[in-house]
Structures are given as structure tokens and as C-alpha cells.
């Protein structure tokens, strides 16, 4: 039993040894090509971890709201991404489902991190803690770390990512570390306040350049012991760690 196939012009003829078969039109190869101008590169979706607050007295008094700072949204937009605010309650409900539609996550600033996550009891100098927010962030953060998803931390976000990787923090810089620098500036937050030294060979140095840079400063906690695969990329003149990244490129 044999099958033969022949192509004549734009027609293909298929026959078997018994004489059965069919003839049909064949589209030219060019018909299957996609025009270059029709291809669109999808913008990366960046999930921004949300926080909550209760409204002031009034019509909606005590109503709990989820929020994401507009600065984070604008920064993602200005750098070619699509920002997606992630409610805290959703982080615990389905972290993998949320991350399935994200290309990276941004962990923002916020209140002090619960020291239980790095094996300590709260010291007298610790400020506001939001246990429900920390629980939600860690649910999403652990899933993102397991998936190898890129993560960018800002302020509390840096401290969170370090603890996520097994590191710990100074609960209060001024009582646990020698320092001559005011890290919690009284100036409006957009003003530059002190200097940091960005280390050669780091990803941060590739972006901003190694050496001395002026920054603002709004924190009283800081990374103490770097976590697994964590690289210190910038320090203040008093040795306080101001920026970190991971050696595997996941924490940027």
C-alpha cells in the first residue's frame, strides 16, 4: 500500500495505490508569514503591592480602603510598564494566580516590618506594625521568590525582601547602631538629604554609576544581616546599608 503526493502549480494531488485521493489548492508560503508591522511587543505588567487605611470621620468614616501611592504608578508608566495594584486580601487568597499575570512586582514603602519574621520581639523604639499587611506581603513574596519573578523594593520593600531571603534588620538605627547621620529627614521627602556610595560591579552601578550619590532618606530601620544571595550595592557614610540586590538578578 503506497501513497503518492505531487504538486503542480498551486494544486496538490494525493493518491493511494488503489487510485483514491483528492486534489486541493495550496496557499503560497508567503500567506503564512506575519507582517513585521503587525507584531506588537506587550508591555510588562508590574504588580504593585497594596496597603490599607481607614478613612477619616465623615460620610465614609472607618471604611477600610486599599491604596497604592501614585508615585509608584507614574514611575511604572513612565518606564514603559503597565502598573497593576494588588489588594492585600487578594495576595493571600491566590498569590500564584495573581503572579501568573505579572512580569514583575514592586514592593513599596510602608510601616515597620513585624520583627517576628526575623525571629525577634518588638523593641521599645519600633513604630507602627501592620501584621495583616505583612502576612499578605509574605504570602505573595514567597510565591514570587519561588517562581523566580523579578522584584524591586523601595524603603520598607528593601527590608522586606532582605527578610524574605533570610536576613534581618535593625529595628531602630539610632539605638542599635553607631551613626552620626539623620536617616529620617525632617525636610520634605523630595529633597536630597545625605550621600550614599554605590559599589562597583553591582547592577545599581550599571544604572546610576558607581561612586557618591545624593539621596533623600525616610527610614529609622535598615538591613542588618544580608539574606541569602543578597549583595549590598550602596551604603551611607556611617555604614548603613541603603540598597541591596540579589546575585541571581531576581531582586533588582
Predicted features, each with a name:
Residues 155:
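Conserved G/P- and acidic residue-centered "switch" motifs that form tight phosphate/ATP-binding loops
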Amino acid at each position: 500500500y503506497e501513497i503518492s503526493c505531487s504538486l503542480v502549480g498551486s494544486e496538490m494531488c494525493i493518491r493511494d495505490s488503489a487510485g483514491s485521493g483528492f486534489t486541493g489548492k495550496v496557499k503560497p508560503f508567503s500567506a503564512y508569514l506575519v507582517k513585521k508591522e503587525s507584531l506588537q511587543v506587550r508591555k510588562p505588567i508590574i504588580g504593585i503591592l497594596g496597603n490599607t487605611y481607614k478613612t477619616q470621620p465623615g460620610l465614609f468614616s472607618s471604611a477600610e480602603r486599599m491604596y497604592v501611592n501614585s508615585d509608584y504608578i507614574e514611575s511604572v508608566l513612565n518606564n514603559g510598564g503597565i502598573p497593576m495594584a494588588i489588594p492585600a486580601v487578594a495576595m493571600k487568597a491566590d498569590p500564584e494566580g495573581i503572579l501568573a499575570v505579572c512580569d514583575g512586582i514592586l514592593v513599596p514603602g510602608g510601616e515597620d516590618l513585624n520583627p517576628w519574621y526575623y525571629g525577634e520581639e518588638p523593641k521599645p523604639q519600633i513604630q507602627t506594625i501592620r501584621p495583616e499587611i505583612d502576612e499578605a506581603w509574605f504570602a505573595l513574596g514567597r510565591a514570587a521568590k519561588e517562581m523566580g519573578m523579578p522584584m524591586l523594593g523601595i524603603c520598607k520593600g528593601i527590608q522586606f525582601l532582605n527578610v524574605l531571603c533570610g536576613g534581618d534588620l535593625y529595628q531602630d538605627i539610632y539605638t542599635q547602631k553607631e551613626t552620626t547621620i539623620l536617616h529620617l529627614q525632617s525636610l520634605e521627602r523630595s529633597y536630597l538629604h545625605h550621600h550614599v556610595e554605590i559599589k562597583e560591579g553591582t547592577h545599581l552601578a550599571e544604572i546610576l554609576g558607581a561612586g557618591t550619590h545624593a539621596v533623600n532618606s525616610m527610614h529609622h530601620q535598615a538591613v542588618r544581616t544580608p539574606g541569602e544571595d543578597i549583595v549590598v550595592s550602596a551604603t551611607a557614610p556611617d555604614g548603613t546599608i541603603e540598597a541591596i540586590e540579589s546575585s541571581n538578578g531576581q531582586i533588582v
